[in-house]
Amino acid sequence: MIETDRLITPAPLSLKEEDLERALRPKHLAEYIGQEKIRGQLQIFIEAARRRREALDHVLLFGPPGLGKTTLAHIVAKEMGVGLRQTSGPVLERPGDLAALLTNLEPNDVLFIDEIHRLSPVVEEILYPALEDYQLDIMIGEGPAARSVKLDLPPFTLVGATTRAGMLTNPLRDRFGIISRLEFYSVEELTQIVMRSAALLGADISPDGATEIARRSRGTPRVVNRLLRRVRDFAEVKAEGRINRQVADAALLMLDVDAIGLDVMDRKLLLTVMEKFGGGPVGVDNLAAAISEERGTIEDVLEPYLIQQGYMKRTPRGRMATSIAYQHFGLALPRNGLSADLWDEKQ
């Protein structure tokens, strides 16, 4: 299965979905649900910057995909009352690409760079003086006649977003004054998001129906909104448009999303560890070959949620399924030496 085919992938599935996301996106911090600590901090920092009529300190947002990093970047610009320029690390291939963006910023504007960990080293070098001194060093000419010219930039705020904070270089990370990690959302928070999105979409949904969708959404707002749209389609055809717990359950089972939010790929990964490798430990390369997936897909897409929920763990010797995973699938715990710690965990 291709990652972009997964209903519960935290990545956007299409440009159309990105348009739908924008329609559901909160515009102000007061409308933003979840991430209370980050929201409270930003509220104070933004208000202080506005009172001083200064640019907000540079902001780094990191965490798994689909948790609202882009939404927060838009909210920062909206709350500051300034413009927003948006791009991504892979798009900025040459120093000139970044220079064109920076020289067109208005005072206190927000520049949002998604996937900032994928900036090329040569572009990153240009960014350092821009962040620290609001200056741009550019080379004019070539060879012996080349010379460096400094251009003054207006004060601005860089909002960087990344799913791989560990891949940022130390010099770049050190230039951010505000660094925040986004966490997975609780079922209660996701239920509020479902109710809000359903109202915007004109969907008729009960609180228990919203909770049923929320608890299968892997702690991710992007996933919960996607599941809501699919359940709405099911309800319009099968239940006269009314979404309750039974309708949501039937729709999600039809979509192959089980009671804890696992899909075919999740179940395949866990069952491979348990049935083919005796519960582990198994190296990630062997596991990738066994399920015909790329190593990066396992590490970046499949594992984070499974580990966070306690169904799998990383050890120095490889990946292991936990007793919780065995219980979920109704399988007996292995009694071999390799998985002895599963028995310790069970006890």
Curated annotation (Swiss-Prot):
GO terms for cellular component: cytoplasm; Holliday junction resolvase complex. Residues 186-256 are annotated as: Small ATPAse domain (RuvB-S). It is found in: Cytoplasm. InterPro entries: AAA+_ATPase, AAA_lid_4, DNA_helicase_Holl-junc_RuvB, P-loop_NTPase, RuvB-like_N, RuvB_C, WH-like_DNA-bd_sf, WH_DNA-bd_sf. Residues 4-185 are annotated as: Large ATPase domain (RuvB-L). Pfam families: AAA_lid_4, RuvB_C, RuvB_N. It comes from the Bacteria. The keyword ATP-binding applies. ATP binds at L24, R25, G66, K69, T70, T71, E132, D133, Y134, R175, Y185, R222. GO terms for biological process: DNA recombination; DNA repair. GO terms for molecular function: ATP binding; ATP hydrolysis activity; four-way junction DNA binding; four-way junction helicase activity. DNA binds at R295, R314, R319. It catalyses: ATP + H2O = ADP + phosphate + H(+). Mg(2+) binds at T70. Homohexamer. Forms an RuvA(8)-RuvB(12)-Holliday junction (HJ) complex. HJ DNA is sandwiched between 2 RuvA tetramers; dsDNA enters through RuvA and exits via RuvB. An RuvB hexamer assembles on each DNA strand where it exits the tetramer. Each RuvB hexamer is contacted by two RuvA subunits (via domain III) on 2 adjacent RuvB subunits; this complex drives branch migration. In the full resolvosome a probable DNA-RuvA(4)-RuvB(12)-RuvC(2) complex forms which resolves the HJ. Has 3 domains, the large (RuvB-L) and small ATPase (RuvB-S) domains and the C-terminal head (RuvB-H) domain. The head domain binds DNA, while the ATPase domains jointly bind ATP, ADP or are empty depending on the state of the subunit in the translocation cycle. During a single DNA translocation step the structure of each domain remains the same, but their relative positions change. Belongs to the RuvB family. This is Holliday junction branch migration complex subunit RuvB. It comes from Nitrosospira multiformis (strain ATCC 25196 / NCIMB 11849 / C 71).
